[in-house]
Amino acid sequence: MRLRSKLVVLCLVCLSCLRLSAQERRNVLLSLPPFERAVVCIKHFEGLHGFKDAPYVGYGHQLLPGEHFTAAMTERQADSLLRADLMKRLMMFKDYGKDALLLAVLSYNVGAGRLLGYGKHPKSRLLRKIESGDRNFYHEFVSFCRYKGKVLRGLVKRRKVEFALFYIP
């Protein structure tokens, strides 16, 4: 009976959230501290990965050699792992000041190497533009919307949302 009452409360909360207009949802999201906003954004777009998504677990954590996380992790464990991963990426980009969180969120999805450069791949145009002081880098940011060479609408939407939430003029 106790579980049933918890489920009823959860359903009522969800229903009340559904009644919020798009503007109200945006205002609630914008009222969160920036790091929390980033966590919510990543959770929304990544979703909780299951067994078929290996080598990714939780909210998109890529398993590293020696790690033994499984897809059967709890939401709380996945949240904790996401926060730790995002904080590492934030530290990677801390020298970019007000753009650090924007770059951390992007790198969570595309990988830090795509931005910073690796091997024969040069540093991204996005970072070069930011380093030069050019604040007009919207097109460079949203250009990270390809998977296996194809533009994916879902990634275009994700980039637009990320830019709207984390770009500071």
Per-segment meaning from a language model:
Residues 49-55:
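Short, flexible loop/turn motifs enriched in small residues
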Residues 1-8:
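Bacterial N-terminal signal peptides that target proteins for export
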Residues 103-113, 145:
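Acidic helix/loop microenvironments that form the catalytic cleft of cell-wall polysaccharide enzymes
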Residues 20-49, 61-66, 73-92, 114-169:
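Long, amphipathic alpha-helical surface segments
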Residues 56-58, 102-107, 137:
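Structural recognition of the beta-strand scaffold that forms the well-ordered cores
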